[in-house]
């Protein structure tokens, strides 16, 4: 909406100015304005542009539950025993455009809170893996799960199986989108 209003009303705001205003609406807004592949840090407002992600089919499934982001962050216990994804290695994987390395190195520490409270999320992840995903992970604080696939046909079969399973109320099949406008 901010991008559109900037165009419609010929405000002349730069992308950076739009991003500064957007973060006041929500942490994800600057990412949507920036477009493309990025490393998000902080609460998601600190963005570093990355090369485009390797194209692949993506299955998205949201169960019929809602998750309180506040609940997840209040119950997150960041101790020395917590395994964090290796961000530097993941960025290198993205630069190499190696889907299998990306899948092996991705992770979400918020799953340690959300999955025990909502086991259906683990069921959805397992279902995707059983149907050919190279990996599946919860998005953000949940409850939505995405799975990366290396073949379109496998992703289509997984999509149909997920819809038939009843695990998710909303199921979408898409692909990585790399339109990073200047």
Model-identified regions with their sequence ranges:
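Conserved, helical-rich catalytic subdomain that frames metal- and/or nucleotide-binding sites
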Residues: 40-135, 150-153, 159-163, 172-182
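Hydrophobic packing within well-folded, soluble alpha/beta domains
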Residues: 1, 5, 22, 121-124, ...
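Short, small-residue alpha-helix embedded
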Residues: 1-8, 139-149
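A glycine- and small-aliphatic-rich helix-loop capping segment at beta-alpha/alpha-beta transitions
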Residues: 4-11, 37, 151-157
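Short, well-structured alpha-helical segments that form the helix of a local strand-helix-strand
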Residues: 13-24, 106, 156-160
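DPxDG-like acidic metal-binding loop motif
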Residues: 1-17, 31
């Amino acid at each position: 909406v901010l991008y559109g209003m900037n165009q419609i009303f010929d405000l002349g705001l730069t992308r950076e100015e739009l991003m500064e205003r957007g973060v006041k609406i929500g942490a994800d807004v600057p990412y949507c304005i920036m477009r493309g592949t990025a490393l998000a840090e902080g609460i998601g407002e600190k963005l570093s542009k990355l090369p485009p992600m390797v194209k692949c089919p993506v299955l998205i499934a949201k169960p019929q539950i809602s998750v309180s982001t506040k609940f997840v962050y209040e119950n997150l216990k960041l101790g020395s025993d917590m395994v964090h994804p290796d961000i530097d290695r993941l960025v290198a994987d993205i630069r190499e455009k190696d889907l299998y390395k990306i899948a092996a190195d991705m992770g979400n520490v918020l799953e340690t809170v959300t999955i025990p409270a909502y086991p259906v999320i683990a069921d959805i992840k397992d279902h995707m893996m059983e149907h050919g995903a190279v990996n599946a992970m919860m998005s953000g604080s949940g409850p939505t799960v995405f799975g990366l696939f290396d073949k379109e046909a496998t992703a289509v079969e997984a999509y149909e199986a997920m819809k038939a399973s009843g695990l998710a109320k909303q199921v979408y099949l898409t692909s990585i989108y790399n339109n990073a406008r200047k």
